[in-house]
Structure formats: structure tokens, C-alpha cells
Amino acid sequence: MDVKFAFAVNSNNEFQKNHFGDTEKFLIYGIESGKLNLLSEELNVSRNMDETHEHGSRKKGLAIINSLKDMGVNVLVSMQFGRNIKMINEHFIPIIIYSEQTEEVVNTLTHQLHWIVDELESAPENYKLFTIKSGILKTVVKK
């Protein structure tokens, strides 16, 4: 399965406590030989779209979703997600992280890839929300 990640980062390639859609750019990672490799850096051209009317607008959310889907992305990684999280998890696995350092997150994800692939293969939509805190990948377990 082809898995691509979009990391929401600032100009210094660090995660920030901003909503996913408010990030400056996305680092796009793919899996090669069992490791995450940086494929490209993409500016968030929808960053300031439609924000004069409503923060977290549906129009902006859909623009970002469509752009990332066109790139083949299926996992989003950020310190925060906004009100569009329900729309996001219909198309992507969202992962909330607590570290600003991309390398730390890359290392954790590399060791936990099987969980991400399993989620993508078992659910075609309405993915679970994952978190990475202190180097540990977690998800909510439904009873």
C-alpha cells in the first residue's frame, strides 16, 4: 500500500501549535525500505483562503483536502486540528503530535508504520484519530 504523510510545519520545518490548515507548508513523506523519506515541500496555498468570513471554513478545508488527495497523501500530522477534523478523518488518518521536531516524529512513525498501514487497510474512511506523545503512538479504542 502506498502511504504518504503530510506534516504541517513552519518555515523552519518545525511543528507549531496551529491548526493543520493554518500551517505555512507541508512536508510530504513517503515510505521507502520501511522508512519515512522526505519527498517534497509544498506551500499551503489555501492558508489564508476564506478566513475573513469564518475561521476553519468548509471551503478552505475542502481546498486543502483536495490538494493533498491529489498528491496521494493519506495521513496528516499536526500539533492541532480545527473544526474540520470530522471532514478530515473521512479522507485521512489524522495524527496529533506533541513535539515540534520533525525528526522525532519521523522516528516514532517509522517504528509504528504497521499500525498506520493496518488502519488504512481496515477502514476505507472515518479513520481513527491517533496521537504521538513521548514517542508513543496511541489511538482511542472503542468499546
Could you tell me what each predicted segment is?
Residues 1-59, 70-71, 96-143:
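Non-catalytic interface/targeting segments
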Residues 60-64:
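Amphipathic coiled-coil/heptad-repeat helices and related helical stalk/stem segments
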Residues 65-99:
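Mid-chain, well-packed structural core segment of small domains
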